[in-house]
Each structure stands twice: as C-alpha cells, then as structure tokens.
Amino acid sequence: KAVMANTADEDRKAACQAWLDTYNDGEANKAATKALVANLEAKVCCDTVADILSKKEYLSKKSVWIFGGDGWAYDIGFGGVDHVLASNKDVNVFVFDTEVYSNTGGQASKASNIGQVAQFAAAGKETKSKALAEMAMTYGYVYVAQIAMGANQLQTMKAIAEAEAHKGPSLIIAYAPCEMHSIKGGMTNCQL
C-alpha cells in the first residue's frame, strides 16, 4: 500500500493492487507476485521498493501444513490441534492415523476403535474412539476429510488439494498402516 500511495505509475499501482487482491489465493498470488516483482525490479525508485525486493521470496502466499500422528492429534496434542482449528486461520492439519500408539509398541489409544485388540487391550478396547473429525466440524468453517492413504491415491490427492484451496483451517485424518498392524509380508505390501 505504501508503494501505491507514493507512485504515479499506473502499471505499478495495478501490479500492487493485483497482489493485494490475490493474497489469500495461493495459485493466483503466484502470478501476481511474479508480475509485481518484475515491475518493482524494472525501477527501484525508493527505499520501500528496495526493502520489498530484498524480501521478495516471502511475498507470495505460503502454504502452511502441520503434520502429526494420531497420538499427538487425539491425545497429548489435542488441545493445540483444537486451538489451531478454532483460530479460523488458513492452516492445514494432516493426521497420520494408525489407530494405536505406534511409537511405543502399539498400545490402544483414543484413536483406537471399540473392540480393537491392541497392547494393553487384549480383550478389545472398551470405549469408542474420539470423534476428532466430528469435533472439528462443529466449528462450521473447518474443512474435514477422512481418507485411507494407501487405498486410493486419487482420493488422497483430491483431499489434499481441497484442503489447500479451502479458505480457513482444514483437517485431514489419514488412515496409515504401520508395523504394529502385522500386515502379512510387512510394510512393503502397503501402498502409500
């Protein structure tokens, strides 16, 4: 806005306005940023322009993703996940859901399903899993998707693209096989 206020160059004003208008649209902002940088580099007329150009790699809208496991999202880090989703900021959360505590030996967790047999739940887990997706949907502005990563790569990519395009927070809960599932033939038989 400072550049627009201090120039009579209509092309420069238009480039600045296009950048401002597209700032929340990642794809459109890439082109607007490229055009703005080209315009500013053509004539460095003041310290403000020089300062902007010195930080040009930070001009375009950034994609923000948080990746974590189900132990983090459903249990120890749930308060933080909920806080991020409640903020209504444009951030994407991707949860790798193995439905057990994979890093500590496959114990039942809040992501484990009722009746699921796991370490310390040999007779089956007695309580149902936390409804993380449903909890996120109660905000009304969170994009939520549940996928099985290895089952359908197109669906996985579609969910990621939709989450990225969503203006606001998104949550993808991705079922992910792990060694604790004792898949016949091992993890080499998993399509991820």
Report the location of each language-model feature.
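N-terminal leader/propeptide and maturation segments of large enzyme subunits in energy/redox metabolism
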Residues: 1-51
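Conserved thiamine diphosphate
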Residues: 2-10, 58-60, 115-165
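Thiamine diphosphate
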Residues: 44-107, 144, 150-167
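Short secondary-structure boundary/capping segments
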Residues: 80-84, 107-117, 185-191
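Glycine-rich loops and low-complexity Gly/Arg-rich segments
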Residues: 90-93, 117-121, 169-171
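Short C-terminal domain-edge/linker segments immediately following a structured domain
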Residues: 96-99, 122-127, 176
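Glycine/aspartate-rich loop-and-adjacent alpha/beta segment that forms the canonical ThDP
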Residues: 156-192
